[in-house]
Amino acid sequence: MPLNVSFTNRNYDLDYDSVQPYFYCDEEENFYQQQQQSELQPPAPSEDIWKKFELLPTPPLSPSRRSGLCSPSYVAVTPFSPRGDNDGGGGSFSTADQLEMVTELLGGDMVNQSFICDPDDETFIKNIIIQDCMWSGFSAAAKLVSEKLASYQAARKDSGSPNPARGHSVCSTSSLYLQDLSAAASECIDPSVVFPYPLNDSSLPKSCTSPDSSAFSPSSDSLLSSTESSPQASPEPLVLHEETPPTTSSDSEEEQEDEEEIDVVSVEKRQAPGKRSESGSPSAGGHIKPPHSPLVLKRCHVSTHQHNYAAPPSTRKDYPAAKRVKLDSVRVLRQISNNRKCTSPRSSDAEENDKRRTHNVLERQRRNELKRSFFALRDQIPELENNEKAPKVVILKKATAYILSIQAEEQKLISEKDLLRKRREQLKHKLEQLRNSCA
């Protein structure tokens, strides 16, 4: 959208806020120039939609003074005007000079640090992407960064005396970290430089901090006091990342940090009271976890040798059926005894599997015994003696008929036996009579 602004007075002194609502960039790709240069706020995928539905705000009634315009960065930018005015930023400007000044404000890297990187600034709050609920994740990330830096600087204050040279490097690194998250990862402090002492040393190592380190976050003292006054607070969260600030602000790594903190708290509860003082000391590794005692698992040999019960049983008369039953029962009892000899503690699943296995073995044994009984009954029937494929129903019917015929024959034989006994008695009595007559 072209700039259509007309001023009656060329030397009219206006503040940036009174003219800002009328300014728009000429080209579409420069609409998010401030966000593209800082790389902290990537351009939204719906730039055209934002421009289409953007309403022109009304100018304020009275010009307000921004903290960014009064900051040293604003004063540092004004002498770099291409016009080379001798005003030095203190006199009246023409319309062209004001336009160039606004362009430099939008494109200057030094001003971007004060306008964009400061979460408390009004420009940061009035940003389009910050106001959108879908793209407001950066606000939470900046809040997390400020909290981490506050705890980081508070821990550095308590750990030792300040060192000016190292404090300057820490300040520069932290400011660069606020400016660019990806660039700060390569400029972090070496842990060996900050903590030159070993882990087992009782004395705390001297760490570097700057005199004005509290300027990074206004809530550093409040965070430190809340951490010390909380009865449930653990000394471990301050020790998690002392040597370097976090290098990412994604949700997945925030969840990982939360899980690690919970893990540290749970481990600290298991430790003895004497070891808690040692766990509170800072270390180069960050996380302090006690060595876990190895679990001693005793294993026992479970007999898995099983016969192939699915194979067709042999009908040969090698040994009697009673001997077969005895051998099978001995084999099953031996398997059960081998399972009971295992003295190691098992879970409920292992016990259930053993019970199921034992039940399956006993069920197979019962079926095999029933099958052998049918085969033995078939061998006793004369009609089915040589028929190995006789069904069980035929075997039962033939066996019933055979039993009835045997019972009828038995009754006949019993009656014959009675007749023969009577005949014998008669013959004995007649023999006695003959002996008496001869005598």
Swiss-Prot record:
Domain bHLH, first and last residues per copy: 354-406
What are the annotated GO cellular component locations? cytoplasm; nucleolus; nucleoplasm; nucleus
| Residue ranges of the region described as Leucine-zipper | 413-434
Q: Where is this motif: 9aaTAD?
A: 100-108
Main location per the UniProt record: nucleus
- Provide the residue span(s) of the region labelled Disordered: 206-294, 335-360
Phosphothreonine: residues carrying this PTM: 8, 58, 315
The Swiss-Prot or TrEMBL note on domains reads: The 9aaTAD motif is a transactivation domain present in a large number of yeast and animal transcription factors.
Q: What is this protein called?
A: Myc proto-oncogene protein
